Amino acid sequence: MTHKVKIHRLSDLSAEQRNKLLQRTESNLDNFIDIVKPIIENVKLNGDKALSEYAKKFDKAEVSTDQIQVTQAEFDEAFTLVDEEVIQTLSYSIDNIKKFHEAQMPEEMWMKQIRPGCYAGDRFTPINAVACYIPRGKGSFPSVAIMTAVPAIVAGVPTAIIITPPGTDGKVDAATLVVAKLVGIDKVFKCGGAQGIAAVAYGTNTVPKCDKVVGPGSPFVVAAKKLLADIIHPGTPAGPSEAIVLADDTANPKLAALDLLVEAEHGPDSSAFLVTNSKELAEQAQVAINEYWQHMDRLRVDFSSTVLSGDNGGIVLTSTFEEAVDFCNDYAAEHLLILSKSPFDHLGKIINAGEILLGENTPISIANYTLGPNAVLPTSMAAKTASPLSVFDYLKSCSIGYLTREGYEELAPHTYRFAKYEGFDAHANAVSHLRDEAIKSEKKIK
Protein backbone atom coordinates (compact mmCIF):
# COMPACT_ATOMS: atom_id res chain seq x y z
CA MET A 1 0.00 0.00 0.00
CA THR A 2 1.33 3.44 -0.98
CA HIS A 3 1.03 6.19 1.61
CA LYS A 4 1.00 9.88 0.86
CA VAL A 5 3.99 12.01 1.86
CA LYS A 6 2.98 15.65 1.75
CA ILE A 7 5.20 18.21 -0.01
CA HIS A 8 4.77 21.73 1.35
CA ARG A 9 6.00 24.29 -1.22
CA LEU A 10 6.95 27.16 1.04
CA SER A 11 6.53 29.84 -1.63
CA ASP A 12 2.90 28.78 -2.15
CA LEU A 13 1.95 29.02 1.52
CA SER A 14 0.28 31.96 3.21
CA ALA A 15 1.71 33.32 6.46
CA GLU A 16 -1.03 31.47 8.33
CA GLN A 17 -0.23 28.17 6.60
CA ARG A 18 3.48 28.62 7.24
CA ASN A 19 2.83 29.29 10.93
CA LYS A 20 0.74 26.12 11.06
CA LEU A 21 3.79 24.13 9.98
CA LEU A 22 5.75 25.63 12.86
CA GLN A 23 3.17 24.61 15.46
CA ARG A 24 3.57 21.40 17.48
CA THR A 25 0.86 18.94 18.38
CA GLU A 26 1.07 19.87 22.07
CA SER A 27 1.03 23.65 21.58
CA ASN A 28 -2.44 23.94 23.13
CA LEU A 29 -2.44 22.28 26.54
CA ASP A 30 -5.73 23.74 27.75
CA ASN A 31 -7.73 20.52 27.40
CA PHE A 32 -5.00 18.48 29.07
CA ILE A 33 -4.69 20.93 31.95
CA ASP A 34 -8.41 20.59 32.72
CA ILE A 35 -8.02 16.79 32.89
CA VAL A 36 -4.81 16.89 34.91
CA LYS A 37 -5.90 19.31 37.67
CA PRO A 38 -8.11 16.85 39.59
CA ILE A 39 -5.47 14.11 39.23
CA ILE A 40 -2.87 16.33 40.87
CA GLU A 41 -5.25 17.28 43.67
CA ASN A 42 -6.14 13.64 44.34
CA VAL A 43 -2.47 12.64 44.61
CA LYS A 44 -1.79 15.61 46.87
CA LEU A 45 -4.59 14.57 49.23
CA ASN A 46 -4.46 10.78 49.01
CA GLY A 47 -0.89 9.94 48.03
CA ASP A 48 -0.18 6.23 47.46
CA LYS A 49 -3.88 5.34 47.43
CA ALA A 50 -4.42 7.68 44.47
CA LEU A 51 -1.38 6.25 42.67
CA SER A 52 -2.79 2.74 43.06
CA GLU A 53 -6.17 3.87 41.72
CA TYR A 54 -4.62 5.58 38.69
CA ALA A 55 -2.44 2.56 37.90
CA LYS A 56 -5.65 0.57 37.56
CA LYS A 57 -7.54 3.30 35.68
CA PHE A 58 -4.88 4.45 33.22
CA ASP A 59 -2.36 1.60 33.05
CA LYS A 60 -4.82 -1.29 33.52
CA ALA A 61 -2.47 -2.57 36.21
CA GLU A 62 -3.07 -3.91 39.70
CA VAL A 63 -0.52 -2.09 41.86
CA SER A 64 -1.29 -2.02 45.58
CA THR A 65 0.16 0.72 47.76
CA ASP A 66 2.87 -1.64 49.02
CA GLN A 67 3.85 -2.54 45.43
CA ILE A 68 4.54 0.99 44.17
CA GLN A 69 8.27 0.73 44.85
CA VAL A 70 10.17 -1.86 42.81
CA THR A 71 11.61 -4.62 45.00
CA GLN A 72 15.04 -6.25 44.85
CA ALA A 73 13.35 -9.42 43.57
CA GLU A 74 11.92 -7.43 40.63
CA PHE A 75 15.38 -6.04 39.84
CA ASP A 76 16.83 -9.55 39.91
CA GLU A 77 14.06 -10.89 37.69
CA ALA A 78 14.66 -8.12 35.14
CA PHE A 79 18.16 -9.41 34.43
CA THR A 80 16.71 -12.83 33.59
CA LEU A 81 14.13 -11.32 31.23
CA VAL A 82 16.49 -9.21 29.12
CA ASP A 83 18.67 -10.92 26.52
CA GLU A 84 22.37 -10.91 27.38
CA GLU A 85 23.26 -9.15 24.11
CA VAL A 86 20.77 -6.39 24.91
CA ILE A 87 22.33 -6.01 28.37
CA GLN A 88 25.74 -5.66 26.68
CA THR A 89 24.34 -2.95 24.39
CA LEU A 90 22.80 -1.12 27.34
CA SER A 91 26.19 -1.23 29.11
CA TYR A 92 27.92 0.02 25.94
CA SER A 93 25.51 2.94 25.66
CA ILE A 94 25.84 3.79 29.36
CA ASP A 95 29.63 3.88 28.98
CA ASN A 96 29.46 6.34 26.05
CA ILE A 97 26.89 8.58 27.71
CA LYS A 98 28.90 8.54 30.93
CA LYS A 99 32.13 9.57 29.15
CA PHE A 100 30.40 12.53 27.51
CA HIS A 101 28.80 13.77 30.73
CA GLU A 102 31.97 13.30 32.77
CA ALA A 103 33.73 15.54 30.24
CA GLN A 104 30.90 18.05 30.68
CA MET A 105 31.34 18.33 34.46
CA PRO A 106 32.65 21.73 35.58
CA GLU A 107 35.29 22.28 38.22
CA GLU A 108 33.73 22.07 41.68
CA MET A 109 34.86 25.65 42.31
CA TRP A 110 36.74 28.35 40.46
CA MET A 111 37.82 31.87 41.43
CA LYS A 112 39.20 34.73 39.39
CA GLN A 113 40.98 37.88 40.55
CA ILE A 114 38.74 40.71 39.33
CA ARG A 115 40.90 43.53 40.77
CA PRO A 116 43.91 43.39 43.11
CA GLY A 117 42.67 41.63 46.24
CA CYS A 118 39.20 41.04 44.75
CA TYR A 119 38.31 37.39 44.11
CA ALA A 120 35.04 36.01 42.72
CA GLY A 121 33.91 32.69 41.32
CA ASP A 122 31.37 29.89 41.27
CA ARG A 123 30.93 26.74 43.32
CA PHE A 124 28.85 23.86 41.94
CA THR A 125 26.87 21.45 44.11
CA PRO A 126 24.33 18.80 43.09
CA ILE A 127 20.58 19.24 43.50
CA ASN A 128 19.48 17.17 46.48
CA ALA A 129 16.67 15.09 44.92
CA VAL A 130 15.84 14.55 41.24
CA ALA A 131 13.22 12.28 39.66
CA CYS A 132 13.88 10.80 36.22
CA TYR A 133 10.60 10.30 34.34
CA ILE A 134 10.65 7.37 31.89
CA PRO A 135 7.60 7.23 29.57
CA ARG A 136 6.06 3.97 28.40
CA GLY A 137 2.86 4.73 26.50
CA LYS A 138 4.03 3.89 22.96
CA GLY A 139 6.74 1.40 23.94
CA SER A 140 9.52 0.88 26.44
CA PHE A 141 12.35 3.39 26.66
CA PRO A 142 15.47 2.19 28.51
CA SER A 143 17.34 4.75 26.39
CA VAL A 144 15.52 7.55 28.23
CA ALA A 145 16.50 5.93 31.52
CA ILE A 146 20.14 6.08 30.42
CA MET A 147 19.91 9.69 29.25
CA THR A 148 18.25 10.94 32.43
CA ALA A 149 19.91 8.74 35.06
CA VAL A 150 23.56 8.80 33.93
CA PRO A 151 24.05 12.58 34.30
CA ALA A 152 22.29 12.44 37.68
CA ILE A 153 24.87 9.95 38.94
CA VAL A 154 27.79 11.78 37.29
CA ALA A 155 26.64 15.04 38.92
CA GLY A 156 26.49 13.34 42.32
CA VAL A 157 22.77 13.83 43.05
CA PRO A 158 22.23 12.34 46.56
CA THR A 159 18.67 11.15 45.87
CA ALA A 160 18.16 10.14 42.24
CA ILE A 161 15.02 8.11 41.55
CA ILE A 162 13.11 6.78 38.54
CA ILE A 163 9.35 7.01 38.07
CA THR A 164 7.68 5.17 35.20
CA PRO A 165 4.25 3.72 34.38
CA PRO A 166 3.72 0.01 35.10
CA GLY A 167 2.72 -2.40 32.37
CA THR A 168 -0.61 -4.23 32.49
CA ASP A 169 1.19 -6.94 34.48
CA GLY A 170 1.95 -4.40 37.20
CA LYS A 171 5.67 -4.49 36.49
CA VAL A 172 8.21 -1.97 35.25
CA ASP A 173 9.85 -2.53 31.85
CA ALA A 174 12.67 -5.02 32.49
CA ALA A 175 15.30 -3.19 30.42
CA THR A 176 14.60 0.02 32.33
CA LEU A 177 15.27 -1.82 35.60
CA VAL A 178 18.50 -3.25 34.17
CA VAL A 179 19.61 0.28 33.25
CA ALA A 180 18.74 1.57 36.72
CA LYS A 181 20.91 -1.10 38.36
CA LEU A 182 23.80 -0.66 35.91
CA VAL A 183 23.78 3.10 36.41
CA GLY A 184 23.43 2.92 40.19
CA ILE A 185 19.81 3.85 40.93
CA ASP A 186 17.97 1.47 43.27
CA LYS A 187 14.80 3.49 43.87
CA VAL A 188 12.26 2.97 41.07
CA PHE A 189 8.54 3.66 41.44
CA LYS A 190 5.54 2.49 39.42
CA CYS A 191 3.79 5.77 38.77
CA GLY A 192 3.54 7.51 35.42
CA GLY A 193 1.57 10.28 33.78
CA ALA A 194 0.36 13.35 35.63
CA GLN A 195 -0.02 11.29 38.81
CA GLY A 196 3.69 10.44 38.77
CA ILE A 197 4.67 14.08 38.42
CA ALA A 198 2.33 15.00 41.28
CA ALA A 199 3.81 12.22 43.44
CA VAL A 200 7.36 13.56 43.20
CA ALA A 201 6.15 17.15 43.55
CA TYR A 202 4.34 16.57 46.84
CA GLY A 203 5.82 13.29 48.02
CA THR A 204 3.79 10.32 49.32
CA ASN A 205 4.40 7.71 52.00
CA THR A 206 6.34 5.72 49.39
CA VAL A 207 7.55 8.20 46.77
CA PRO A 208 10.04 10.82 48.00
CA LYS A 209 9.39 14.50 47.36
CA CYS A 210 11.90 15.76 44.80
CA ASP A 211 13.29 19.17 43.90
CA LYS A 212 13.24 18.56 40.15
CA VAL A 213 11.85 16.16 37.55
CA VAL A 214 13.53 15.48 34.20
CA GLY A 215 12.55 13.48 31.15
CA PRO A 216 10.08 13.58 28.25
CA GLY A 217 6.43 12.64 28.40
CA SER A 218 2.94 12.88 26.97
CA PRO A 219 0.93 16.12 26.88
CA PHE A 220 -0.57 15.01 30.22
CA VAL A 221 2.93 14.91 31.72
CA VAL A 222 3.81 18.27 30.16
CA ALA A 223 0.57 19.79 31.51
CA ALA A 224 1.29 18.44 35.00
CA LYS A 225 4.80 19.87 34.94
CA LYS A 226 3.40 23.24 33.91
CA LEU A 227 0.83 23.25 36.72
CA LEU A 228 3.36 22.14 39.34
CA ALA A 229 6.25 24.35 38.22
CA ASP A 230 6.07 26.43 41.41
CA ILE A 231 6.47 23.28 43.52
CA ILE A 232 8.93 21.18 41.53
CA HIS A 233 11.34 22.33 38.82
CA PRO A 234 9.93 20.89 35.56
CA GLY A 235 13.28 20.50 33.78
CA THR A 236 13.92 20.94 30.07
CA PRO A 237 10.66 21.13 28.08
CA ALA A 238 10.48 17.70 26.44
CA GLY A 239 7.28 16.74 24.67
CA PRO A 240 6.57 14.60 21.60
CA SER A 241 9.52 13.88 19.28
CA GLU A 242 10.39 16.22 16.43
CA ALA A 243 13.11 16.40 13.79
CA ILE A 244 14.26 18.21 10.69
CA VAL A 245 16.50 16.72 8.04
CA LEU A 246 18.08 19.66 6.22
CA ALA A 247 19.38 18.54 2.83
CA ASP A 248 21.09 20.46 0.05
CA ASP A 249 21.30 19.32 -3.57
CA THR A 250 24.38 17.17 -2.87
CA ALA A 251 22.54 14.98 -0.34
CA ASN A 252 21.49 11.37 -0.86
CA PRO A 253 17.65 11.29 -1.08
CA LYS A 254 17.46 7.71 0.20
CA LEU A 255 19.43 8.64 3.32
CA ALA A 256 17.18 11.67 3.78
CA ALA A 257 14.17 9.33 3.67
CA LEU A 258 15.72 6.85 6.12
CA ASP A 259 16.56 9.53 8.66
CA LEU A 260 13.25 11.38 8.31
CA LEU A 261 11.38 8.25 9.39
CA VAL A 262 13.40 7.94 12.62
CA GLU A 263 11.47 10.53 14.62
CA ALA A 264 8.25 10.20 12.62
CA GLU A 265 7.77 6.62 13.86
CA HIS A 266 7.57 7.65 17.52
CA GLY A 267 3.87 8.42 17.34
CA PRO A 268 1.13 10.36 15.55
CA ASP A 269 1.90 13.37 17.76
CA SER A 270 5.50 13.57 16.46
CA SER A 271 6.74 16.15 13.97
CA ALA A 272 9.23 15.41 11.18
CA PHE A 273 10.23 17.43 8.12
CA LEU A 274 12.70 17.02 5.29
CA VAL A 275 13.64 20.59 4.34
CA THR A 276 15.38 21.11 1.01
CA ASN A 277 15.65 23.47 -1.92
CA SER A 278 16.07 20.56 -4.37
CA LYS A 279 12.85 19.52 -6.11
CA GLU A 280 14.57 16.45 -7.50
CA LEU A 281 15.75 15.34 -4.06
CA ALA A 282 12.29 15.97 -2.58
CA GLU A 283 10.57 13.80 -5.17
CA GLN A 284 13.15 11.01 -4.90
CA ALA A 285 12.91 11.03 -1.11
CA GLN A 286 9.12 10.86 -1.38
CA VAL A 287 9.44 7.62 -3.37
CA ALA A 288 12.12 6.22 -1.06
CA ILE A 289 9.98 6.76 2.04
CA ASN A 290 7.31 4.47 0.59
CA GLU A 291 9.99 1.87 -0.13
CA TYR A 292 11.27 1.96 3.45
CA TRP A 293 7.77 1.60 4.86
CA GLN A 294 7.89 -1.95 3.49
CA HIS A 295 10.60 -2.69 6.08
CA MET A 296 8.69 -1.36 9.10
CA ASP A 297 6.09 -2.77 11.48
CA ARG A 298 2.51 -1.79 10.65
CA LEU A 299 2.12 0.26 13.84
CA ARG A 300 5.24 2.33 13.05
CA VAL A 301 4.06 2.78 9.46
CA ASP A 302 0.72 4.06 10.74
CA PHE A 303 2.44 6.48 13.13
CA SER A 304 4.91 7.85 10.57
CA SER A 305 2.45 8.03 7.68
CA THR A 306 0.08 10.04 9.87
CA VAL A 307 2.89 12.47 10.66
CA LEU A 308 4.23 12.78 7.11
CA SER A 309 0.84 13.29 5.46
CA GLY A 310 -0.29 16.21 7.61
CA ASP A 311 0.83 19.64 8.76
CA ASN A 312 3.25 18.24 11.35
CA GLY A 313 5.47 16.52 8.84
CA GLY A 314 6.41 15.80 5.26
CA ILE A 315 8.75 17.61 2.90
CA VAL A 316 9.24 21.38 2.91
CA LEU A 317 10.44 22.56 -0.50
CA THR A 318 12.05 26.00 -0.53
CA SER A 319 13.21 28.25 -3.37
CA THR A 320 16.76 28.61 -2.02
CA PHE A 321 18.95 26.87 0.53
CA GLU A 322 19.07 30.10 2.55
CA GLU A 323 15.28 29.95 2.80
CA ALA A 324 15.58 26.34 3.98
CA VAL A 325 18.00 27.44 6.72
CA ASP A 326 15.65 30.26 7.77
CA PHE A 327 12.78 27.78 8.10
CA CYS A 328 14.95 25.52 10.27
CA ASN A 329 15.88 28.39 12.58
CA ASP A 330 12.24 29.46 12.85
CA TYR A 331 11.22 25.87 13.61
CA ALA A 332 13.93 25.29 16.28
CA ALA A 333 13.75 21.51 16.07
CA GLU A 334 14.60 19.04 18.79
CA HIS A 335 16.83 17.10 16.35
CA LEU A 336 18.40 18.60 13.23
CA LEU A 337 20.44 16.53 10.78
CA ILE A 338 22.40 18.24 8.01
CA LEU A 339 22.81 16.03 4.93
CA SER A 340 25.36 17.47 2.54
CA LYS A 341 28.72 16.61 1.05
CA SER A 342 30.03 19.54 3.13
CA PRO A 343 27.88 19.64 6.30
CA PHE A 344 30.37 21.75 8.26
CA ASP A 345 29.88 24.54 5.71
CA HIS A 346 26.28 24.83 6.91
CA LEU A 347 26.83 24.29 10.64
CA GLY A 348 27.36 27.97 11.48
CA LYS A 349 24.08 28.93 9.80
CA ILE A 350 21.97 26.97 12.30
CA ILE A 351 21.33 28.88 15.52
CA ASN A 352 18.20 27.17 16.88
CA ALA A 353 18.23 23.39 17.42
CA GLY A 354 18.37 20.97 20.32
CA GLU A 355 21.12 19.03 18.58
CA ILE A 356 22.86 19.36 15.22
CA LEU A 357 24.10 16.17 13.57
CA LEU A 358 26.49 16.41 10.65
CA GLY A 359 26.68 14.25 7.57
CA GLU A 360 25.47 10.94 6.23
CA ASN A 361 27.33 8.85 8.84
CA THR A 362 25.61 10.50 11.82
CA PRO A 363 21.97 9.34 11.79
CA ILE A 364 19.56 10.54 14.45
CA SER A 365 19.09 6.98 15.71
CA ILE A 366 22.76 6.74 16.75
CA ALA A 367 22.47 10.07 18.58
CA ASN A 368 19.35 8.75 20.31
CA TYR A 369 21.12 5.72 21.71
CA THR A 370 24.89 5.51 21.67
CA LEU A 371 26.74 8.65 20.50
CA GLY A 372 27.29 10.30 23.87
CA PRO A 373 25.45 13.65 23.99
CA ASN A 374 22.13 13.63 25.78
CA ALA A 375 19.09 12.74 23.69
CA VAL A 376 16.60 14.48 25.99
CA LEU A 377 16.30 17.71 24.06
CA PRO A 378 14.12 20.84 24.12
CA THR A 379 10.94 20.60 22.04
CA SER A 380 8.14 22.92 20.93
CA MET A 381 10.52 25.73 19.86
CA ALA A 382 12.16 25.71 23.30
CA ALA A 383 15.50 25.23 21.52
CA LYS A 384 15.40 28.98 20.89
CA THR A 385 16.14 29.52 24.57
CA ALA A 386 16.77 26.11 26.18
CA SER A 387 19.55 23.51 25.97
CA PRO A 388 19.81 19.71 25.93
CA LEU A 389 19.66 17.84 29.22
CA SER A 390 23.14 17.87 30.76
CA VAL A 391 24.98 17.59 34.06
CA PHE A 392 24.13 21.26 34.60
CA ASP A 393 20.47 20.28 34.97
CA TYR A 394 21.47 18.33 38.07
CA LEU A 395 23.77 20.99 39.50
CA LYS A 396 23.28 24.43 40.95
CA SER A 397 25.93 27.10 41.18
CA CYS A 398 26.57 29.47 44.05
CA SER A 399 28.60 32.65 43.57
CA ILE A 400 31.66 32.97 45.81
CA GLY A 401 33.36 36.24 46.78
CA TYR A 402 36.39 37.12 48.88
CA LEU A 403 38.16 40.46 49.47
CA THR A 404 41.48 41.16 51.10
CA ARG A 405 41.84 44.54 52.83
CA GLU A 406 43.43 45.82 49.64
CA GLY A 407 40.45 44.57 47.65
CA TYR A 408 37.97 46.15 50.04
CA GLU A 409 39.67 49.53 49.79
CA GLU A 410 39.60 49.21 45.99
CA LEU A 411 35.84 48.58 45.76
CA ALA A 412 34.44 50.46 48.77
CA PRO A 413 34.47 54.04 47.37
CA HIS A 414 32.65 53.00 44.19
CA THR A 415 30.19 50.93 46.19
CA TYR A 416 29.53 53.88 48.53
CA ARG A 417 28.72 56.20 45.62
CA PHE A 418 26.46 53.58 44.03
CA ALA A 419 24.53 53.06 47.27
CA LYS A 420 24.09 56.79 47.93
CA TYR A 421 22.87 57.35 44.36
CA GLU A 422 20.22 54.62 44.74
CA GLY A 423 19.23 55.83 48.19
CA PHE A 424 20.28 52.83 50.28
CA ASP A 425 21.76 54.20 53.49
CA ALA A 426 22.54 50.84 55.09
CA HIS A 427 24.40 49.78 51.95
CA ALA A 428 26.47 52.96 52.10
CA ASN A 429 27.07 52.71 55.86
CA ALA A 430 28.46 49.18 55.44
CA VAL A 431 31.33 50.53 53.32
CA SER A 432 31.84 53.87 55.12
CA HIS A 433 33.95 55.05 58.05
CA LEU A 434 31.44 53.21 60.26
CA ARG A 435 32.90 49.90 59.11
CA ASP A 436 36.44 51.02 59.91
CA GLU A 437 35.31 52.17 63.36
CA ALA A 438 33.58 48.83 63.99
CA ILE A 439 36.74 46.95 63.09
CA LYS A 440 38.86 49.17 65.36
CA SER A 441 36.45 48.75 68.27
CA GLU A 442 36.64 44.96 67.98
CA LYS A 443 40.43 45.11 68.14
CA LYS A 444 40.24 47.25 71.30
CA ILE A 445 37.92 44.74 72.99
CA LYS A 446 40.36 41.92 72.27
Curated annotation (Swiss-Prot):
GO terms for cellular component: cytosol. One of its GO terms (molecular function) is histidinol dehydrogenase activity. PROSITE patterns: HISOL_DEHYDROGENASE. Binds 1 zinc ion per subunit. Its cofactor is Zn(2+). The active site is at E334 (proton acceptor), H335 (proton acceptor). Zn(2+) binds at H266, H427. One of its GO terms (biological process) is L-histidine biosynthetic process. It is an enzyme of class 1 (oxidoreductase). Keywords: Metal-binding, Oxidoreductase, Zinc. The keyword Metal-binding applies. Its EC number is 1.1.-.-. Belongs to the histidinol dehydrogenase family. This is Histidinol dehydrogenase homolog. The lineage of its organism: Bacteria, Pseudomonadati, Pseudomonadota, Gammaproteobacteria, Alteromonadales.
